[in-house]
């Protein structure tokens, strides 16, 4: 009777405690998780028909580069690591889904006890095993105990806490997927930039070799004219110095070519090898099928913006789960009752949400600025290419005229040197501008989602 009274008192106190906790009200959190508001326009006219990102194998129409991209997606170590992070997030998602399901446990146990002869249990057992007691009721010595246990437990999601945890896990898994897509976009664009810069270096080498042949021819001509008394040693030395300068630039260019080839091999996850590539003239003919869209609308395609948005959704779900954790949990099992509430992330979740919101707005702002900068730079670069090509043609014509006039002794060697230097500088700059234009198109493609 005493035991029953004690149980009733404990149960009554526990019930009133549960009722009291149920009457508590969790503090309200301000729903400040709006999406970032971006400008409607920037003064330019865009083609708003482009609403989906191009796949990488459509944007990059060079079959050689496409083959390298496929190898990189299979072998690149950094990309493999990002894929493993997705696997980890998927495992956490499965765990969060399991929280909504009942837990069933099965246990098997066995033990052997031998009681000492002069202990309380040993003496008690010897007195219990009297001859008048049936044999099957005797306590064996040693005493063997076998057990089979089955238990059941299920936490009812009455406040939505477990559902919110599942939503947070789903959002974080989606964020990890977006992070992997971003890693793929970065990998492909970085590989393409190195590839096109390598093609530009090939063209620079061709131009430098042509300039070296021309400077050597001029050097030999001035030496011959000096022997005839028509030129001075100063002219010979100037042309000789120019020839040596171009040889030095050729060595530097070859070094850069080797570095680019090794960088590409590293992105492919293989040891260095000779990289096959198209010619510079073929590169000029390949289109980059990227329509121009409103940056504010296109930002939704960026994996980093989508990942930040998923993190924001996850943090909001964490806040709701923390609010639900403020209330007691109802756990159904072998017996019914209320567990004490778990404060858990109650104090940290709101701050985490504000951090995620701030990071989301920061990511969106940086993304918008990056897209606009690249778009404007691309427009300017196209005009620079046009002007530089006209300038290069004019310098090339000047070189031809200067050489002819020098042979006729109408101009001195300084005019010839000056014309050749201006043409070489203009041609090298033209190659750099075209290569940089390709790089900006690739970066703009990545900034608008990168085909993910």
Where are these regions (language model features)?
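Terminal intrinsically disordered/low-complexity segments used for targeting and assembly
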Residues: 1-74, 254-300, 446-452
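Amphipathic alpha-helical coiled-coil scaffold segments and their short linker/junction regions
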Residues: 49-50, 58, 65, 69, ...
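Transmembrane beta-barrel architecture of outer-membrane proteins
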Residues: 65-67, 88, 145-147, 193, ...
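Small/polar (Gly/Ser/Thr/Ala-rich) solvent-exposed segments
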Residues: 80, 103-123, 133-142, 147, ...
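Membrane-embedded segments
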Residues: 84, 88-91
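Short segments within alpha-helical structural elements
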Residues: 216-220, 245-273, 322, 390-448
